[in-house]
């Protein structure tokens, strides 16, 4: 079972998308400085059961379903992503899974496949000294799948503020 604790409609977490963001519990990463340590616990409601109704309610106003975490039941995550895709919504996963900092874009597919090949995927544990996605020094990376090249492209720079 995959559980979610709460939900929100967000506009910045996935560039160019209006996302239904779902905070997934049972996070295995336990990052120091985590802004949501309660998500480490196995708490919340059954997402697989509730997702059809959530998509019925919010589907016309969103373009993406964002899973903030992947929980501990990858089969349920895949089924939830599949349901969103069948409704013609994009999918995104934020994971604390670390990947090599010098990874080539063509190798990102290997790691994304572990998360059922979402349209967007954010990799990387939160490291306070490096900052989150908005920091140019972050270890975190956000990728978007490009169906034309059949590769994930690094879009992390879209989170960085432009100098004024």
Regions found by a protein language model. Give the residues of each.
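Short, flexible, glycine/charge-rich loop motifs used to bind or transfer phosphoryl groups or to couple energy/partner
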Residues: 11, 54-56, 109-112, 131-132
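Short, acidic Gly/Pro/Ser/Thr-rich loop/turn segments
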Residues: 29-32, 128, 150-152
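Core AdoMet radical
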Residues: 35-48, 60-74, 89-105, 115, ...
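P-loop/Walker A phosphate-binding loop and immediately adjacent motor/lid segment at beta-alpha junctions
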Residues: 73-81, 85, 131-164
